[in-house]
Amino acid sequence: HEPAGSSNYTEDGRYVQPGQPGQPGGTGGSPAVFYSTDFYTQKLISYIDANKQDGKPFFAYAAYTSPHWPLQVPDPWLHKYAGVYDAGYDAIRNARIARQKALGLIPADFKPFDGLPETTVASPATANNGTASAKYINAVHSAADGYSDYGPGKVDKLWSSLSPAERKAQARYMEIYAGMVENLDYNIGLLIQHLKDIGEYGNTFIMFQSDNGAEGWPIDSGADPTATDTANAQEPTYSALGTDNGKQNAQRLQYGLRWAEVSAAPFRLTKGYSGEGGVSTPTIVHLPGQSQALPTLRAFTHVTDNTATFLAVAGVTPPSQPAPPLVNTLTGVDQNKGKVVYNNRYVYPVTGQSLLPVLTGSATGEVHTTPFGDEAYGRAYLRSADGRWKALWTEPPLGPLDGHWQLYDLASDRGETTDVSAQNPSVIGTLVDQWKTYMGNVGGVEPLRPRGYY
């Protein structure tokens, strides 16, 4: 399970090359079969065991690749979900949302996002797209400012528009993905069981977290950029899906936008976008000494809170002593501005908040009490200090064609189904001004042409 050309493995500064002679998965190597999730788990267990006699606390980071593409998983997980997803995107997504409501994960009256509209061909780009004279709409320049250009957009077909062959291939992609998730769960179980076996489980803080929303690339008809769904439904290709068959398409197979919308349910948009489906991720925490499940934490938290939380668990106070000025004689810029002193080095301070108070129940309410935002690929969002409002910018054609910032009332519409910016001009105006002020203060520069990694 290794995407072509986009990953590397090192141990103690030495490259590990899976599949090569003498290397994991290669001739004469150990293990004989390399699957990253299995390999990482066993390596991490060996690291824990190598130092367990020193009596010191340990920090272990299991940075799994799975279930990121390529869609590959070994037996017995490869065929475990055969036929489970034949009902298609809508049926599976609706069933998941119903179960979320039944479990109390979302309110019974939660209004989910229905998915992006179908266009089976590229949404047209503006005439100047790709030319030197193009003036692309971005988060600071809208159509009202004279900027009107954007590139083409593509959206996957709905299930009802797929041919029988396309449905066959699409269902198989999700079967493989589900197998990858269960294999990941199995390996996490091995880690937890090992902690129990060595008597450390009850004394260990464990956090499981995804790094982003569901992966929806490529936003195009068909989920494999090197082969069509129709071709993937034919033998011998179909039977080889999910295996490392040595072909380039095996190294790039993914499940596409529509299954990503299923994974992101009940939220809007996917990885790379600032909609709730792109920025909301599952997190599960086990506290030292915890013996039973605790209530679900519903406060807004951010990945930057993790470091502050880990330090709090270890009883370490984050560094706060301001660093002395270090002015560049050529530019006049203080290179230590905003930094603090740590171990005689000048570093940026920990910006997150410890989650221990809310996790243990000693504090309630919002973790972040100031406006909080994020940005990727020029796609930005900002939450209001009270957590109610969310200003969001997405480039056309998936965002508004005039380039305006959208506004959602998260208190009643976390599914982001209704843009209420026109009804609340002062709210959206304040949030956008706050975002622009922050960008100006930190020297943030918007890309001239916002677009994602795809």
What are these regions (language model features)?
Residues Q53-A60, E200-I206, E366-H368, S384-W389:
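Loop/turn elements at helix/coil->beta-strand transitions in domains of secreted/extracellular proteins
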Residues K56-F58, I106, F110-A144, N183-D224, ...:
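Metal-dependent active-site segment of extracytoplasmic phospho-/sulfohydrolases and closely related
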Residues P112-P152, S161-R167, P396-W405, L410-Y454:
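Long, internal low-complexity/basic segments
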Residues N249-G278, Q290-L410, V442:
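C-terminal cap/loop subdomain of S1 sulfatases and analogous C-terminal strand-loop tails that border
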